[in-house]
Amino acid sequence: MALLGLAVAAVAAYAAQAGVSSGGGRCATYRPHIPSHSQFSKVIDNPYFPLPAGRTLIYRGVENGRKELDRVHVTSRTKRIEGISATVVDDNVYEPIGRLAERTFDYYAQDDRRNVWYLGEDTREFLPGGKVDTSGSWLTGRNGAKPGLIMEADPRVSDAYRQECRSGEAEDLAWVVDRGGSNRVPYRTFHHVLRSLEFSRLEPAIVDQKVYGPGVGAISERQLSGGHETLSLVRVTG
């Protein structure tokens, strides 16, 4: 209950900070301070969101009673977005295990202060009957889309920020609620973890708690409201 209360406070706090209301202009008034092209590095080594080429992370969990597997692979490929060279991450969700339910290519870049920027995603959800849903896809510079931060260089409790911004398609936000402590997942126990609440203006009833471990990145996810989903890190290679 306490975390749900924090989630509500986070939405209100961020709306006030960003100068937008929950039903207002949203991305139109959002003006991120994007560093110049020369201020982006070639590697992403933020302790809470490292993306070394070749690394693969495997997560297992349950969504609304169905088992799922999430395979996240950091490719060696890059994509140039608005002059910035972004690392391409290939994220595949299998639900039930064995059936590819969703495939997403995410694009990230790190500035020289070690903030990790989220520059866009190409997502495909595979529906019954061979249909493919691409809603949620966005790319910085197209259709008014703007980048957000997926991880700050030095995240602090009470920090709130946009992770992505394309009105009506991608409006995820994050609020840091704890830094420190330990968290055990099947892969191993992590110390000095970071916890955040993540939510979207498009689905305000859904609030996720995510935990990030130093040196690895996301290690667990749990839906606190709006559904029943859990994911935990089980293996890391590369």
Task: Give names to the regions the model predicted.
Residues 14, 19-238:
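Conserved functional acidic sites
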Residues 1-18:
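Secretory targeting and sorting signals
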